[in-house]
Amino acid sequence: MLLVRASRAVRCCCSYSLHKTVTFQARHSLYSAHKVHSNGHFHLPLSGIRCFFSGSPYWKAKKHGGEHSKAGNLTAIDDYWLEEVEEELEDLDLSPHTASLLQGAHRVFIVHPDVKWGAKKDQLSTADLQVAEAAALVHSLPNWSVVNTLIMSTKSPDSKLIFGKGNFQTLTDVIKGHPQITAVFLNVERLSSLTEKEMEEAWGVKVFDRYTVVLNIFRFNAHTKEAKLQIALAELPLLRSSLKNETAHMDQQGGGSRYIMGSGETFLEVQQRLLKEREIKIKYALEKVKKKRNLLRTQRRRREFPIISILGYTNSGKTTLIKALTGDEGLQPRDQLFATLDVTSHAGLLPCHMPVIYVDTIGFLSQLPHNLIESFSATLEDVVHSDLLIHVRDISHPETTKQKASVLSVLKNLGLPQQLLDTMIEVQNKIDLIDMPENTEDSVLSVSALHGHGLEDLKQQVETAVMKSTGRNVVTIKVNLESPQLSWLYKEASVQEVKVLPEDGTARVRVIITNSAYGKYRKLFCK
């Protein structure tokens, strides 16, 4: 693959007038290899070289009036775009900012900023429980371990270095006094690039926030092209932040504002353009995936399969519940955060033998930046188009109340129809791990998906809700056995019972049928 990329880049160079000597270096990074050296050589990764020349689809689009610049204009996009993106995504090391996470081991020191009072204090959790979740995130990555944890109080978590001078110095002394520490996980939503840089310089180790740790758990668990594309899109803010830091460092050395190869562009402008082109390609590819999803969704609608989306906090037992409801032995649930990153569909039957589609979704997590969730918006679109939602909760988890609030907050931001939210069934899973809770709400059911407790009641409630939400009715129809009526009903409805009346060659058929299908039946056979 590397030789192919090199040859393509070199061929392009033949038609380009270079004012600087270009030293080709085989790097996967978009910008980490870009260095202007004192000898005048400019080191550029091959993927970047390819973007400079007129053979790039980016420049072809600009030549022809920019009609390709709109992501929604899928009919004008050549398959070259998707092939290019898939080629770059074949290796998981998509960016230098996060590549080091997945290479080798890390001995992590978890630091949790504890806000004692004020609007920033978490009212639904405790510092100890939040540290426990942070540790679970660390253990989700291979060869990562937790060396120690520390809860450090802070009055101003939004300040530049999170902590006051005294606490920050204490923290610095602790980290430097333990050479076995190779990384610090600061348990906050997102650190600015400047804060991250200053902390790394002060402590001498890598510093991660929840965004980078969760993003790399996603990368480790991503197996499909769609998941990798979504993660590549979510990585772009990190790439841009690192670019600012690197450019600032080069400016101090007098190289950041130097024009490159006589192109009239500075280093920063080149990198910004490369990142923009990368973003365009990824979004184009995701639009293609989205179009395929819409096609599948349309086919389901034509066949009138009810769609039931299973959602909930990460590791709440969603996949285990789907396995229990469908009997699909091919499903292999894992006791792991973010084990599911792709939406998968699974056929099942309700007690009335009506076929339905259960949709397994990505798990939610508290304190995730909006743009990380937004990168998976195409995946979550299946939730919006559901006929019924089932919210699975790990009722045995000490933070189950906070987890519920986090899930409901995300659902609210998705802009779901209010009727879909009002009819959502809440499933309190893992009751085998605690004393049986007492439910007072009709829409709340207690189950153990692993051991099968409460599943029959759940199936009945799901059936009732689906019948109501999809406008299905139980109808008894008299059919002529010599006509195609019965075979039509088997195809277009859910046949419950057939009572043959041999004396007149007819049968009474009890079916579950939608209003639209019943209208078609009457039009065909009741003239």
From Swiss-Prot:
Family annotation (CDD domains): HflX (cd01878)
NCBIfam families: GTP_HflX
Keyword annotations from UniProtKB, A to Z: GTP-binding, Magnesium, Metal-binding, Nucleotide-binding
UniProt keyword annotation of Cell division present: no
Sequence positions that bind Mg(2+): T319, T340
InterPro entries assigned: G_HFLX_dom (IPR030394), GTP-bd (IPR006073), GTP-bd_M (IPR032305), GTPase_HflX (IPR016496), GTPase_HflX_N (IPR025121), GTPase_HflX_N_sf (IPR042108), P-loop_NTPase (IPR027417)
Gene name per UniProt: gtpbp6
Residues noted as binding GTP in the record, renumbered to the chain: 312-319, 338-342, 360-363, 429-432, 448-450
Cellular component aspect of the GO annotation: cytoplasm
Name the record gives this protein: Putative GTP-binding protein 6
Record organism: Xenopus laevis (African clawed frog)
A Pfam family recorded for this sequence: MMR_HSR1
UniProt similarity note: Belongs to the TRAFAC class OBG-HflX-like GTPase superfamily. HflX GTPase family.
Domain of life: Eukaryota
Cofactors required: Mg(2+)
GO MF terms held by the record: GTP binding; metal ion binding; ribosome binding
Keyword Transferase: no
Ranges for domain Hflx-type G: 306-470
